């Protein structure tokens, strides 16, 4: 299980904000990775995207994905980071399916990944 470590990522160079909040060590590690990736033009955690999805009890929910990333080749990608132990959770899979459809309708990509 991921360590729940929250905090501020100060002065990111590729985010339009002067800080970004992280909710876990996985998110913090992804921020470091995005900052160092020469192909990433811009990334943000505070992007305002909310994706509707239906849970196992057929209730509509809303989900805000972890990152919106813009690459130098023009691709816009939503990245969700998860602990490996949660990748196959039924609700995570439902969110993923909804996010993939949402992104496809907007010419974007969706990637779910884990980080060690």
What are these regions (language model features)?
Residues 1-116:
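Electrostatic, structured charged patches in enzyme active sites and in nucleic-acid/phosphate-binding
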């Amino acid at each position: 299980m991921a360590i729940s470590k929250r905090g501020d990522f100060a002065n990111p160079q590729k985010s339009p904000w002067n800080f970004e909040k992280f909710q876990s060590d996985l998110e913090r590690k992804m921020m470091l990775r995005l900052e160092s990736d020469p192909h990433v033009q811009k990334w943000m955690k505070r992007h305002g995207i909310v994706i509707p999805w239906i849970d196992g009890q057929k209730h509509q929910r809303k989900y805000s994905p972890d990152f919106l990333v813009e690459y130098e080749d023009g691709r816009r990608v939503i990245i969700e980071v998860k602990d490996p132990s949660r990748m196959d959770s039924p609700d995570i899979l439902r969110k993923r399916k909804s996010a993939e459809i949402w992104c496809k309708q907007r010419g974007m990509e969706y990637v779910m990944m884990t980080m060690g």
